[in-house]
Amino acid sequence: MGNFIRKLPGLRAWAQVDLGAVIHNFDEAKAKIAPDMRLLAVVKADAYGHGATEVAHALESRADMFAVATAEEALELRQDGIKGDILILGYAPDDSFDDLIENDITPTVDTLEEAYELNDTAERFGRRAKAHIALDTGMSRIGFCANEEGIAQIKEVCALPNIDVRGIFSHFSTADEEDKSFSLLQKERFSSVCAALAAAGINIPIKHLSNSAGIVDLPPCFDMARAGIILYGLYPSDEVERSMKLKPALSLYAKVNFLKEIDEGTAVGYGRTFVANKKTRVATLCAGYADGIPRMIARDGYVLLCGKRAKIIGRVCMDQMMIDVTDIPDVKIGSVATIIGRDGKEEITADEFARWAGTISYEILCGISKRVPRLYDKTK
């Protein structure tokens, strides 16, 4: 934890983001793909809770493209000065097309109706709108089907005069699992559709299929890969190999705002779910579920205080949580607890934190709320 954090007044809970780690992780991902492949940085959901604008600025000289989930996320990046290519991976409503075309943002097209609406909007502007085509190879989420009907529809999209189809992509649904058989089937389906389009004289310049799990665990394929969770120093699952030297980029902290000693038999928190079986010293932290700490975590979870693990007790409240610090006498009002991150020789990773909450690291990071300030360390 940077010493400068301790000197900042008025903070109750905060996240520290190491942009140098993000840059390092991007370079690690780049080294895993083929030299002639492009690498896209996924910064959707506020860069998985790390801050999309700050992450994009840090990677702007490296990333070939940025990806977001919504039109609002894309426009915010443009307004904050990001000049690189921005792809919207998810749904963009028709009434956003004017702004997207005007700001040179690339939407995803996954239906004919959407394509015709984008084409008509571009015609009004006197421009050709960029687009990527989504292909469903087995995720069953969005995209044209990987069959004859889907191929015919994609050909129709590519024939529209005011759409410049720059890319086509699909998404691995099980690449983070040990069994890669379905991922290989998805790759085969994707290749087959691209080959059928090429046979019809349609050569879409950027084909991309690999997500973070694909980058980590599968051979490089096609023209571009999409780095998501690995940018932030975390692996997609426990089932992928761990040969990359990833650095977690986010740490989460909260201050101790209250200390008291309770007697045996005294209950702590809502529902009286914890009852002390001995005299217990309790610290209250300034972080709760409104900050992104799941209520579920109280059963198994810990924080770090003074370089030691301290058990969460009682239910996590909206704005506070209670910790057993009986065996950590150095804790005082204003002490800083590490919720995710390292303190001395001890570390709580986002993955461990997520296991306590019965979820995945992605959800934990994205769930850290807006009221938690993000502080940035830009050294590499």
Predicted regions and their residues:
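Conserved PLP-enzyme active-site core in the AAT-like
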Residues: 32
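Active-site anion/phosphate-binding pocket segments in diverse small-molecule metabolic enzymes
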Residues: 2-23, 73, 92-94, 99, ...
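Active-site-proximal beta-alpha core segment in soluble small-molecule metabolic enzymes
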Residues: 2-4, 9, 13-16, 23-24, ...
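Class I S-adenosylmethionine-dependent transferase superfamily signal
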Residues: 29
